[in-house]
Regions:
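Conserved ABC ATPase signature
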Residues: 37-41
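ABC ATPase "signature
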Residues: 120-121
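Hydrophobic anchor residue at the start of the ABC signature
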Residues: 51, 79
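Conserved catalytic motifs of ABC-family nucleotide-binding domains
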Residues: 58
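Catalytic Walker B motif of ABC-type/P-loop ATPase nucleotide-binding domains
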Residues: 62-65
Length: 158
């Protein structure tokens, strides 16, 4: 029902509508839940359904807000596999996440702290900015902490 509803919103009709729904039901492994009310789906399947609905119309740009929040690690990995497949097919995907290890999958990222963007760049560039004698191979978490501390110092000086 959800996918049919969103297909209608996106203006998909006839054969194209049915093909899109069938393709995404298969892609996201929703076959065994076709007769299940969305409210009754396990969380991971609710997330799959939401992503399937969001891509029914094959958008050029997709915004995902915390797409893997609350799901288990296996489902999280599977979700990123779907996201990466979309990117490989030319879709621009903008993701918000609190999981820095997920941000590593992104080509570019922006770090937001206290409502302001404090840094932007490729994950490797941000990690390199935190490199020091004490931390020769910084993680993205190390970079985030260093950039937050730098921002705090700058705010104190102003």
């Amino acid at each position: 029902q959800n996918m049919d509803f969103f297909a209608g919103i996106y203006g998909l009709t006839g054969k194209k509508r049915l093909e899109a729904i069938d393709r995404l039901v298969s892609t996201f492994g929703l076959d065994s839940y076709l007769e299940t009310n969305a409210i009754m789906l396990p969380l991971g399947y609710k997330q799959r359904l939401a992503l399937a609905c969001a891509v029914l119309h094959e958008p050029d740009v997709l915004f995902l807000d915390e797409p893997t929040s609350g799901v288990d690690p296996l489902t999280r990995r599977e979700f990123w596999s779907h996201i990466n497949a979309m990117v490989a097919n030319g879709v621009t995907v903008v993701v918000t996440t609190h999981f820095l290890e997920e941000a590593e999958y992104c080509d570019r990222m922006a770090l937001i702290y206290r409502g302001r963007m404090i840094a932007a760049g490729a994950p490797d560039e941000l990690k390199a900015s935190a490199r020091s004698e004490d931390i020769p191979e910084p993680t993205l978490e190390d970079a985030f902490i260093a950039l937050v501390e730098k921002d705090d110092r700058q705010r104190e000086q102003t």
